[in-house]
């Protein structure tokens, strides 16, 4: 993502944003909230004198509109962001319109920006200069490859070995050759992780096949394979070492600490009412909010209050397991400095 930030007056103002990939659209999905004013060039039907006689001949032309946002949808597989709202600037003021944003579009967003918003923009800018990180998880007879997106790991390939109906290769040799062949196509940083010694065999073959590879290769020891191994790797801080991105690791470690404290009956709050009480007492050390609540006025107000008290604020991705677990606790929780019971 590229961004041009005008001087903000008391955190309010205009920021021009230039999304470059699906990760950037995901960031925009969390930055554009109801009530924001978004300017973008879009296609809209323009009526002429002939159009009134033959409305089916209405022509769509590019126009620049300002939309007062009502809702936003992120479509991961079509790589598109849909912004719904009412036109406040441009043609047909007062009419409803949907902006269909894709990588390469330029938009301007006018709103009150929170500290977590500006942190997200900074993260997106830094992420645009980094190559994609892949994590290969390997255990006996099973391999899965994940691409690390801003909103969590996405499985892009898998392979099973054995004699069952779901097996794709039958021998250990075929399995390791197929895995090495697949990951040898990658050019960016690679993490190979899993329990036991199977990964060691894969790593040795990979290095023999790619002796001149310059991108980082990191080994991760985990207790499990598959998606659980990916979460372990992220929690170990390996992504931070590869590209400096702390966010996903923060989500893992904060959720782990929350569950540990709940299990030991140590100071925490979860659910909107309990967190509101803790915030009012100034007891919040770390506020955790799942991104689906960013459009909720009560949650947004608690974020602003927490930032004003210099509490840490961590926004969780609803598409990553820690965020899914946080959603099960009401979508918002806090680690407290002291008990308020």
From Swiss-Prot:
Domain description: The N-terminal domain has the RNA-binding Sm fold. It harbors the endoribonuclease activity.
Keywords: Cytoplasm, Endonuclease, Hydrolase, Metal-binding, Nuclease
Subcellular location: Cytoplasm
Species the sequence originates in: Methanospirillum hungatei JF-1 (strain ATCC 27890 / DSM 864 / NBRC 100397 / JF-1)
Cofactor: a divalent metal cation
GO biological process: nonfunctional rRNA decay; nuclear-transcribed mRNA catabolic process, no-go decay; nuclear-transcribed mRNA catabolic process, non-stop decay; ribosome disassembly; RNA surveillance
SUPFAM superfamilies xrefs: Dom34/Pelota N-terminal domain-like, L30e-like, Translational machinery components
GO cellular component, one term: cytoplasm
SMART domains: eRF1_1
Assembly: Monomer.
PANTHER family: PELOTA, PROTEIN PELOTA HOMOLOG
UniProt name for this protein: Protein pelota homolog
Function: May function in recognizing stalled ribosomes, interact with stem-loop structures in stalled mRNA molecules, and effect endonucleolytic cleavage of the mRNA. May play a role in the release non-functional ribosomes and degradation of damaged mRNAs. Has endoribonuclease activity.
């Amino acid at each position: 993502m590229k961004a041009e930030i005008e001087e903000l007056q008391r955190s309010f103002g205009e920021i021009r944003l230039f999304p470059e990939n699906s990760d950037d659209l995901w960031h925009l999905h969390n930055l554009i909230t109801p009530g924001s004013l978004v300017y973008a060039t879009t296609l809209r039907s323009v009526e002429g004198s002939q159009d009134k006689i033959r409305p089916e001949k209405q022509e769509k032309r590019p126009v620049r509109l300002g939309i007062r946002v009502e809702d936003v949808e992120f479509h991961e597989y079509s790589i598109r962001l849909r912004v719904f709202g009412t036109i406040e600037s441009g043609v047909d003021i007062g009419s409803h319109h949907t902006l269909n944003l894709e990588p390469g579009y330029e938009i301007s967003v006018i709103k009150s920006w929170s500290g977590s918003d500006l942190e997200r923009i900074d993260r997106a800018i830094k992420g645009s200069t980094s190559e994609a990180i892949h994590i290969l998880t390997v255990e006996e007879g099973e391999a899965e490859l994940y691409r690390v997106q801003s909103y969590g790991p996405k499985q892009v390939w898998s392979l099973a070995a054995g004699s069952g109906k779901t097996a794709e290769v039958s021998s250990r040799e075929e399995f390791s050759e197929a895995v090495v062949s697949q990951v040898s196509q990658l050019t960016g940083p690679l993490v190979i992780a899993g329990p036991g010694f199977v990964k060691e065999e894969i790593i040795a073959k990979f290095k023999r096949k790619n002796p001149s590879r310059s991108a980082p290769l990191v080994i991760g020891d985990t207790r499990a394979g598959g998606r659980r191994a990916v979460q372990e790797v992220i929690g170990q801080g390996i992504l931070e070492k590869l590209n400096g991105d702390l966010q996903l690791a923060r989500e893992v470690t904060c959720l782990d600490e929350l569950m540990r404290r709940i299990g030991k009956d140590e100071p925490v709050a979860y659910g909107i009412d309990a967190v509101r009480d803790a915030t009012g007492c100034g007891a919040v050390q770390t506020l955790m909010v799942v991104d689906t609540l960013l459009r909720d006025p009560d949650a947004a107000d608690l974020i602003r209050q927490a930032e004003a008290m210099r509490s840490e604020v961590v926004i969780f991705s609803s598409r990553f397991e820690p965020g899914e677990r946080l959603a099960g606790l009401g979508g918002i929780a806090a680690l407290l400095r002291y008990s308020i019971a």
